[in-house]
Amino acid sequence: MDHFPLKRPHFFFTTAPLPCPYVSGRLERKIVTELNGTDADSLHEALSRAGFRRSHSIAYTPACPGCSACIPVRIVADDFVPDRTMRRIWRANGGLTASKVPARASADQFRLFARYQESRHSGGDMALMGFYDYRSMVEDSPIDTFIVEFRDGDGNLAAACLADRMNDGLSAVYSFFDPDLASRSLGTFMVLWLVEEAKRMALPFVYLGYWIGESRKMSYKTRYQPLEAFGPDGWKRFAPGDGA
């Protein structure tokens, strides 16, 4: 009799419903699973292509009762053409130096992260994070994760982006910047940098997480065209007005 090794079963769980942080009056619930073991990379790749996102060593996707507002989106890097505003933002930040560094938390990063949270999200849970919470967010990753630091000519940290590298693209996990430089549109600049880096690495996509048409914090993502959205028929081109 032939014997075949059995794959270790992978378990998925649903979280308890909580108030949605993006759309007032709705409940948020997620399907989650842990990324661990020797297959963490391959599992993350497969789940990302199915619309999941990563936080720490957890992959998750929304499964909210009576709501499907969260739509996974990704930029088609090779076909992306920045608009006039994006070109201006790129030029305005040309004096910054970008460095890809290992996913290791530093005091310099945390100081900037804390200032950003206090300025932009003072009422949110992330504003309460201490250094060890921040370190966990950065370092608790079982996959290929890195940080891009953007520094000015004096070596001051102006912005940073935590990102994952996958076989088919780069995934923007979290970014933050100096609130005193808000007029420089550094959030947009970091997305543009990831697109250019994906092109340089011959990777087809930049994953941006979820587009939510009813949330100003999340609806901006349709500015990056061409964009693809994940739905029942897989990844399809997605433009402003599609499903909005």
From Swiss-Prot:
The chemistry this enzyme catalyses reads: N-terminal L-glutamyl-[protein] + L-leucyl-tRNA(Leu) = N-terminal L-leucyl-L-glutamyl-[protein] + tRNA(Leu) + H(+); N-terminal L-aspartyl-[protein] + L-leucyl-tRNA(Leu) = N-terminal L-leucyl-L-aspartyl-[protein] + tRNA(Leu) + H(+)
Domain of life the protein comes from: Bacteria
Q: Which InterPro entries match?
A: Acyl_CoA_acyltransferase, Asp_Glu_LeuTrfase, N-end_Aminoacyl_Trfase, N-end_Aminoacyl_Trfase_C, N-end_Aminoacyl_Trfase_N
Sorted alphabetically, the Gene Ontology BP terms of this entry are: ubiquitin-dependent protein catabolic process via the N-end rule pathway
Q: Which UniProt keywords apply?
A: Acyltransferase, Cytoplasm, Transferase
Q: Where in the cell is it found?
A: Cytoplasm
- Would you tell me the Gene Ontology cellular component terms? cytoplasm
The UniProt record lists the EC number as 2.3.2.29
Query: Where does the chain cross the membrane?
Result: none
> Can you name one GO molecular function term for this protein?
arginyl-tRNA--protein transferase activity
Q: Which of the seven top EC classes does this enzyme belong to?
A: transferase
Family from the record:
Belongs to the R-transferase family. Bpt subfamily.
Q: What role does this protein play? A: Functions in the N-end rule pathway of protein degradation where it conjugates Leu from its aminoacyl-tRNA to the N-termini of proteins containing an N-terminal aspartate or glutamate.
Its name, as the record gives it, is: Aspartate/glutamate leucyltransferase
Annotated source species: Paramagnetospirillum magneticum (strain ATCC 700264 / AMB-1) (Magnetospirillum magneticum)
